[in-house]
């Protein structure tokens, strides 16, 4: 992960007038390359909003986001090279475990041989190898969350992996 610098605030209102109008009060934060960080706070305090701003799913109403010294505030999620693992597993029930893990790589045009190798590595790491040919629809919630995690980890070009209450 490249160094991440945040100097932002976010409101869903056009002209916030008070602290209560903000989903995220003005903040400045720095996350160094290679670190592991946790955002702690009560429900509704803005943790998910901040993760969505970092990943590019939401644009902050004020301020900027920088990766490795480059401003990415207006860049798409794809251009940011971020993987996000959401609280509720994001998988395709109509696909097998292997197809779910391969999905991000196929969408980026990775060669089939590389996809097979990388899917195998991730499946082994997450103890999903025995289930690769199983339909995702029949799996328990914890296995579905592992698949969601695997989809975040399968790409070797990811700058950061964000976990939202996985």
Language model features with spans:
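Conserved ABC ATPase "signature" region
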Residues: 71-73, 106, 113-131, 162
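Conserved ABC transporter NBD signature motif
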Residues: 63-71
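Helix-to-loop junction immediately C-terminal to a conserved catalytic motif
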Residues: 55
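Conserved ABC ATPase signature
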Residues: 135-139, 143
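Short coil-to-helix segment of the ABC ATPase nucleotide-binding domain corresponding to the Q-loop/switch region
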Residues: 95-104, 135
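A short, flexible loop at the N-terminus of ABC-type nucleotide-binding domains that lies
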Residues: 1-33, 74-76, 109
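The feature captures the beta-strand-to-loop junction immediately N-terminal to the Walker
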Residues: 40-42
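ABC ATPase nucleotide-binding domain "signature" region
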Residues: 38, 84, 147-153
């Amino acid at each position: 992960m490249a160094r991440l610098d945040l100097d932002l605030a976010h409101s869903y209102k056009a002209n916030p007038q008070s602290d209560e109008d903000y989903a995220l009060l003005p903040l400045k934060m720095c996350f160094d390359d290679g670190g592991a960080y946790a955002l702690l706070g009560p429900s509704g305090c803005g943790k998910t909003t901040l993760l969505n701003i970092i990943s590019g799913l939401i644009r902050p109403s004020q301020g900027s986001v920088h990766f490795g010294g480059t401003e990415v505030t207006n860049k798409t999620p794809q251009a940011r090279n971020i993987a996000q693992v959401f609280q509720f597993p994001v998988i395709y029930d109509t696909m097998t475990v292997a197809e779910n893990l391969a999905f991000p790589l196929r969408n980026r045009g990775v060669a089939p041989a590389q996809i097979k190798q990388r899917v195998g590595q991730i499946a082994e790491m997450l103890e999903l190898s025995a289930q690769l040919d199983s339909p995702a629809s029949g799996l328990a919630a914890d296995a579905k969350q592992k698949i969601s995690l695997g989809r975040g980890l399968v790409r070797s070009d990811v700058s950061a992996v964000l976990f939202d209450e996985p």
